Amino acid sequence: MLTNRQLQILQVIIDDFILSAQPVGSRQISKKQGITFSPATIRNEMADLEELGYLEKTHTSSGRVPSEKGYRFYVDHLLSPQGINSRDIQQIQSIFNDRLVEVEHIIRKSANILSELTSYTSILLGPDVQRHRVKRFSIVPLSSDTAVAIIVTNNGHVENRLFNLPPDFTASDLEKMVNILNDRLIGVSLEELHKSLEAEVLAVLQQHVQSADDFYPRTRNSDNAIIQKAKIFYGGKTNMFNQPEFHDLNKVRMILDLMETTSQVQSLFHPNESGIHIRIGSENKQLEMENCSVITTTYSIGDDQQGAIAIIGPTRMDYKRVVALLDVIRLDLTQAFTKNRSE
């Protein structure tokens, strides 16, 4: 159990180190407003905090820096909510001012603005595309033998896929096909699209549309591409280059390589957990992230779908600011997407 004096000193050290990235000494602490202890007393308390594992001594300075245990204690017990200034709020609100239709546009813009506001790397997962439901299906001919299939989902997600038309496929056939597809597929999830096509739609197409047997295989690969496409959005991938902890290019390269692997990126998230979660250093499962902190949260799209947000930075992350920003943006995203679905 830490004393009140130790708590106060630990908080000052961590707050100062987050701002400066420089070891914090006793004289520096003694000059802080609200600190009434002598440098000698502070040195003794710092030595005790080091012995308890909350601080570490560097080789190049007599000052101390927080340990991973120190950061964990700080996050769990000393982190106080930080207000967001009007400029930050205005920048966040700009995400929603354009009245963009597609969910992906809003998520991509959110990733960029989060990285700008935090100076760290942001990653946003879109909602699970497989759970989207078909809202509208259309086919637009581009030439006598080529067309584009367009699927619009209930979340505003739009997919376009080119394919070749069968020989002798007429405009009348195309119109009949689009009507049948919309009649049978609206409300069907992309996950169930193939099953619905094969179980219900194909037989109807064969009755009313010439070359239906030839047409279906041509569109099947396009549907597979839609379902398998991962929706991950990045902001500020190279922001870590600006942090003194990552002047070692090998460390940065390892993290960038991790971000290129979809399964590794998805493992950073806890999509089934609500609230904000902070993992520090070795608490991350990935070896590449041992010098990083990862803060994650989720946002909702209606009652049945979720997306997720992660901020990646050094363990010397400005936790107060990141948590405050994530708290605002996750609620704003949820509100915006819920409103869009109800309209």
From Swiss-Prot:
InterPro entries: GAF-like_dom_sf, HrcA, HrcA_C, WH-like_DNA-bd_sf, WH_DNA-bd_sf, WHTH_transcript_rep_HrcA_IDD. One of its GO terms (molecular function) is DNA binding. It comes from the Bacteria. The keyword Secreted does not apply. It holds the Pfam family HrcA. GO terms for biological process: negative regulation of DNA-templated transcription. Disulfide bonds: none annotated. Keywords: Repressor, Stress response, Transcription, Transcription regulation. HAMAP family: HrcA (MF_00081). Negative regulator of class I heat shock genes (grpE-dnaK-dnaJ and groELS operons). Prevents heat-shock induction of these operons. Belongs to the HrcA family. This is Heat-inducible transcription repressor HrcA. It comes from Lysinibacillus sphaericus.
